[in-house]
């Protein structure tokens, strides 16, 4: 049984990504798009082109048919309902391009766009999409101190030598921040810097004043992490609230599931901050973008504030229903949003792809077994050392001769070591097979369960 249905766009004269819709959402999505097409006089593409101040040719150059539909739903809900849309497209369908289109829409419609995302290195990805939408000259206020926006199309240094000799381990929050900082330093060195965050003192002055310098910035770029200290420092949250009072604000929530989290059974500080903004500034408009928007009930609770769900149930009622109903209830809510034209998800079709060529490497079993045993020997030695260090640390803490120190459980890394080791055993053989197929004129796709970017970055 097919799990997806071919996506039929309302725009017939634009390039298509040949996407599909999950079968359980297909009927609702088709019905919603039909209503939208009828409401717009059968010219969805013309509606979007008009709102983005683009010719039909420019629109078709910038956006695929699927993306035009998503942008049309977002704009229509803002203008006709004062409500939001959840764009839940799979990676590769172009959520970033749709977000950039909404930034352009906001700029041209008298809004102050505020772009939220998960990591500040994604600011440069958004700039790339903004270039494609013809708004590269729009000046962002980068709220994250010390962060730059770079142009990936302008390389200033071809090669970068990595001197790091750190051993990779599963990342915690501090590790992620460190990795982001290292990547930002690499970006700043390797690509042309087009925009920079103001100096920390200047940013602080802007926050305290609660207003943007006149004619200095056109929109904001900010990460969710900027609100993580809002419990003890309300500076940034108050700044955003002040902007919402002074301007017509359009929030573009990229990686929107990151705006809704739970910590120790309670909504995270970031979630509380986002919810406070949405509750106290009902005049603001929003667009949510996330491929995993329904992975947790808390995400849906944040989104419901700006959709038809807000009229159907109170927050507490919906919260109880989602927790009791589990996944089936979340799917039902998703289908309700899709039917209302307030959620859309498109995915890549797997049709037409060649049968994967699996390389089991059985002929190398003895060699790989020997290599695996060598790695495991050293890992066991590290476990012994870790156990010894943990004992020493515990004694030191007992006698108050060491500051609080938490040892990372070495055994917890076994899964990741095994994962990397298996990849390394296969890499050479797979690469050789890929080269051979390329020489035969074939296009090669190497499927991986994980890019392991953290490791590759240091290789």
Task: List where the protein language model places each region.
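Conserved pre-motif I regulatory segment
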Residues: 29-86
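Conserved Walker A/P-loop ATP-binding site and its immediately adjacent core
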Residues: 96-98, 110-154, 294-299, 450
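Inter-Walker segment of RecA-like/P-loop motor cores
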Residues: 137-232
């Amino acid at each position: 049984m097919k799990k997806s249905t071919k996506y039929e766009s309302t725009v017939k004269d634009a390039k298509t990504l040949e996407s599909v819709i999950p079968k359980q959402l297909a009927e609702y999505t088709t019905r919603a798009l039909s209503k939208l097409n009828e409401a717009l006089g059968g010219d969805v593409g013309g509606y979007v082109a008009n709102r983005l101040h683009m010719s039909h040719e420019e629109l078709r150059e910038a956006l695929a048919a699927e993306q035009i539909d998503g942008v049309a739903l977002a704009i229509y809900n803002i203008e006709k309902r004062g409500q939001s849309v959840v764009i839940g497209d799979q990676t590769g369908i172009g959520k970033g391009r749709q977000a950039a289109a909404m930034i352009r829409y906001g700029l041209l419609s008298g809004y102050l766009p505020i772009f939220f995302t998960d990591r500040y290195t994604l600011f440069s990805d958004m700039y790339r999409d903004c270039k494609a939408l013809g708004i590269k000259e729009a000046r962002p206020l980068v709220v994250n101190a010390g962060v730059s926006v770079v142009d990936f199309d302008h390389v200033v240094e071809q090669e970068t030598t990595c001197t790091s000799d750190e051993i990779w381990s599963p990342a915690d929050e501090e590790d992620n921040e460190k990795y982001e900082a290292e990547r930002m330093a690499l970006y700043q060195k390797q690509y042309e810097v087009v925009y920079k965050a103001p100096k920390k003192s200047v940013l602080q002055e802007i926050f305290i004043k609660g207003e943007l310098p006149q004619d200095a910035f056109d929109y904001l770029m900010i990460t969710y992490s900027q609100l993580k200290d809002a419990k003890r420092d309300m500076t940034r949250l108050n700044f955003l609230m002040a902007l919402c009072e002074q301007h017509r604000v359009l929030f573009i929530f990229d990686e929107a599931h990151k705006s809704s989290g739970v910590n120790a059974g309670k909504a995270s500080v970031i979630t509380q901050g986002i919810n406070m903004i949405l509750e106290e500034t009902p005049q603001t408009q929003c667009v949510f973008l996330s491929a995993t928007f329904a992975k947790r009930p808390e995400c849906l609770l944040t989104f419901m504030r700006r959709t038809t769900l807000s009229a159907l149930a109170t927050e507490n009622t919906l919260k109880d229903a989602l927790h009791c109903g589990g996944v089936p209830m979340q799917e039902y809510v998703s289908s309700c949003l899709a039917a209302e034209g307030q959620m859309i998800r498109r995915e890549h079709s797997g049709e037409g792809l060649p049968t994967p060529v699996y390389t089991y490497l059985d002929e190398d079993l003895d060699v790989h077994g020997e290599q695996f045993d060598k790695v495991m020997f050293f890992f066991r030695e590290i476990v012994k050392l870790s156990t010894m260090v943990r004992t020493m640390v515990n004694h030191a803490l007992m006698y108050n001769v060491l500051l609080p120190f938490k040892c990372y459980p070495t055994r917890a890394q076994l899964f990741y070591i095994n994962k990397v080791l298996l990849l390394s055993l296969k890499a050479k053989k797979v690469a050789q097979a890929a080269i051979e197929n390329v020489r035969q004129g074939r296009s090669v796709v190497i499927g991986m369960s994980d890019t392991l970017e953290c490791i590759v970055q240091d290789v």
